[in-house]
Amino acid sequence: MPPLPELFANNRRWADDQRARDPDFFARLASQQQPRYMWIGCSDSRVPANEIIGLPPGEVFVHRNIANVVVHSDLNCLSVLQFAIDVLHVKDVIICGHYGCAGVRAALSEDRAGLSDNWLMHVRDVARTHRRLIERLPALPARQNRLAELNVLSQLANVCHTTVVRDAWARGQEVCVHGWIYDVHDGLLRDLGVEISAHETLMPAVESAFARMEASVPG
């Protein structure tokens, strides 16, 4: 890991490079933020939101936690979601999980992870609910990847069930919720094919995604 003084030097170079490319960048950024996107992702250091979608500061409003979980009792996450939708008026909310997620791996195993076990119970609940879809896959890495995908769909549904999103839809605000997965092995995002812009479309879209997963397993 770089020593701390080097981080300040890196920051100076980054700021100088930004000003060289766009002299008004920081003045414009300081005046206000108008992100179109909200990103709910994993805290994993290999999955930095802005970098993997190629957007500069000011374009994405980000909330991250272990295994990209959305819980209706988590005031941290709900406050970020409410600010993004009600104040910033973001149009797209992206729930992005990733393959190789340590939280998902721990949730699928019987190993204890300490305090975070309590948090990962939410992911273990997803694994129990969809055990058949997971256990149809013979190899452990494939099962872990499948749980990462199922977890995204579950958290997407949780977002859509929040009063924040449902109230926005009720007043006619344009909000679309997306489920994506990121592969740390090749750096590519994959769309899980679920985009929800009205509450009544949620369950049909999620059930269709489950059916596609079922059909993707031979035999």
Residues of each region from the PLM?
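Divalent-metal-activated hydrolytic enzyme cores
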Residues: 1-35, 67-91, 102-219
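N-terminal short beta-loop-beta anion/metal-coordinating cradle
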Residues: 18-59
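Short beta-strand segments
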Residues: 40-42, 64, 94-98, 178-183
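Gly/Ser/Thr-rich loops at beta-strand to alpha-helix junctions
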Residues: 44-46, 98-103
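Glycine/charged-rich beta-loop-alpha catalytic/anionic-binding loops adjacent to active sites
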Residues: 57-68
